Amino acid sequence: MVLAHDWLTGMRGGERVLSLICEQFPQAKLHTLIHKQGAVDENIARQVVATSFLQHLPGISRWYRYALPLFPYAIEHMRPPEADLIISTSHCVAKGLPTHAPAKHLCYCFTPMRYAWVFYEEYFGKNPAKKWLLGLILNYLRDWDKQTAEHVTRFVAISHHIRKRIEKYYGREADVVYPPVDVNRLFITGKSPQRFDLIVSALVPYKRIDLAIKAYNQSKFPLKIVGTGTEYRALRSVAKQNIEFLGWQSDDSIRALYQQCRCLVFPGEEDFGIVPVEAQACGRPVVAYAKGGALETIVDGQTGVFFHEQTPDALNEAVQQCAAIEWDQERIRKNAERFSNEEFLIGLAQAIRRTLTM
C-alpha cells in the first residue's frame, strides 16, 4: 500500500485524518510534496516519507503556498513503488500521484482543489492588475485537476456537501465517510456554562471571523477567540474590549474552553467542520451559518441554531435564540458520537473493499 498527502506542515483537520490512517497502515510509504520536520504527530512521523523536489528549496515550509502552480508538476514527478492500493488524502494535488497499473487508487477527498474552484479569490487576492495571470493559472489548475480525477478508481467525500462538489467539477460519484473526531477524549462536565461564547478557528478570510467580531462588537457579550493566522492583526485592531484573542492553545485547553463556553460560534462555510463536532462532544450547542458541512453535523434546535444570512444582525439573532434554549447536553453529545474514530474506520474499511473489487 502507498499513501499520499498534499503536504506535512502542521496538524490540522486533514493531518488528523492521515494520522489515523497511518496508525492502521504503519508499513505504507507516504508520499507528500513537503515535510516540515517536527510538524506532525508520531503516527505520521513513523512512516517512511518520500518528498518532492520542492522539499529542497530553501525555506519552502514557510512560503510553499506561493509555489502552487508548481504543485502538479512536483506530484507527477514523484515515483511511488508498485502497490495494490494507493490511498490519497487530498484537497489539492495528492490525488495526482502516479499510479502503476493494475493498482487501485482510493481518494479520500476533502474537496476538489480548493484554490482552483471555490476560494481562489481568498487565495490569489482580488487585484485587478493580476486578473489576467489569475485566469491563466486557474485554467491550468482546473484542467489538471479534472484530468487527474479520471485516474482515481474511487472517490470518498468527507461530507454530502463535498460529494456534490465532486460530482459538479469531476463528473464522478463518491461515497461519503465523515472525518474522524476523537470524541473519546471529550466529555461533559455537568457544570453550568460561564459567561462567554467561543470561536476556535484559523484566522483567515474565508472563516468569516470578521463577521463574528462585528456581531459581538454590537452585542458587547464576551467572546473568546482561539487561533492564529494571517488576519490576526487586522481582526484584533477592530475588536472591542469584550472580545479576547487567546492565540494558539493546546488540545486540553481547548477542551476546557468547549466545556466552559455558553456556545460555539461557527460563522463561515466549511466543507465539514471538526470544531463544531468537538464542541458538541462536550455538550455545548453551536451557532452556525446554514451552509456546507454544518448542515450535516448540527441538528437545528436540538444541538445548535443556524443563521441563514452572513450579517451581524442574523448572527446576533441566532445567538440570542441559542441563549434562550434549555439544552440537553447528553443529546448534544450523542449527536457528536456519529463522527467517532471508530465510525470513520468502519467506513474506510468498506470503501477499501469496494475499491479493490472494482
Feature map (PLM): residue ranges:
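Acidic donor-binding loop of glycosyltransferase active sites
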Residues: 259-271, 284
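Short hydrophobic beta-strand element within catalytic cores of glycosyltransferases
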Residues: 265, 285-289, 298
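A charged, aromatic-enriched C-terminal amphipathic alpha-helix characteristic of glycosyltransferases
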Residues: 310, 323-354
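Active-site donor-binding segments of glycosyltransferases and PAPS-dependent sulfotransferases
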Residues: 27-95
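Membrane-proximal helix-turn-helix segments that form the acceptor-binding/catalytic region
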Residues: 125-155, 163
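Conserved acidic donor-binding segment of nucleotide-sugar-dependent glycosyltransferases
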Residues: 247, 300-301, 305-312, 319-326
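Conserved donor-binding/catalytic core segment of Leloir-type glycosyltransferases
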Residues: 183, 187-207, 211-224
